[in-house]
Regions:
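Intrinsic-disorder/low-complexity, polar/charged segments enriched in Ser/Thr/Lys/Arg/Asp/Glu/Gln
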Residues: 30-34, 124, 149
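A generic structural signal for well-ordered coil/turn residues at beta-strand boundaries
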Residues: 29-31, 111, 136
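Beta-strand/loop substructures that line and gate deep hydrophobic ligand-binding cavities in soluble
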Residues: 131-150
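Core RNA-modification/binding signature centered on pseudouridine synthases
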Residues: 116, 128-132
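Hydrophobic ligand-binding cavity/cleft-lining segments
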Residues: 2-97
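Short beta-strand or tight-loop elements
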Residues: 113, 123, 134-138
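Short, hydrophobic/aromatic-rich segments at coil-to-beta transitions
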Residues: 120-127
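Heme-based O2/NO sensor domains and their adjacent alpha-helical segments
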Residues: 103-119
Length: 150
């Protein structure tokens, strides 16, 4: 089994019965990646927990430097003002959720990451970010890899 990340054709995402297709159907799909992970059919919550716990402050120096530059440019250009984000410039995707997905996810992110959880199921999760430049979604899905893993 190949343990490296691989960019996929967007049709790989479109073929899945993801809930995100209905919730964010007016968003443009930028790219799709297969990321190596260990686990079985019930291990998606572990991946979500890992994503939730990411902190740029724990990253290598080069990654931390990129975050510092990004936040400084954002402050200089006014990209991240509160009035340009979620529930200000744009409504959260949570307002589009069907009742069965609308329950509080219980997830939070460190202040250093500007993502907000939209929904989590047993095999997919969506997180959103909004500022002056973008309203974007990070969607994670748990798909069998064909080699007994996910």
């Amino acid at each position: 089994m190949d343990h490296s990340a691989a960019r996929l054709d967007p049709s790989a995402h479109a073929r899945q019965p993801w809930r995100i297709h209905d919730i964010a159907n007016d968003f443009r799909l930028e790219d799709v990646w297969a990321l190596p992970s260990r686990g079985g059919p019930d291990d998606f919550p572990r991946l979500v927990s890992l994503i939730q716990s990411l902190d740029p402050g724990d990253s290598p120096l080069a990654v931390r430097a990129l975050f510092v530059v990004r936040w400084q440019l954002g402050a200089l250009l006014g990209l991240d003002r509160g009035e340009t984000g979620l529930d200000a410039r744009v409504d959260s995707l949570r307002t589009r959720l069907p009742e069965e997905l609308a329950a509080d996810t219980g997830l939070t992110f460190p202040e250093s990451l500007p993502f907000r959880p939209v929904y989590v199921t047993d095999r997919e999760a969506a997180f959103e970010i909004a500022n002056t430049a973008v309203h974007a979604v990070m969607h994670l899905g748990w798909v069998p890899d064909g080699d007994g893993g996910y």
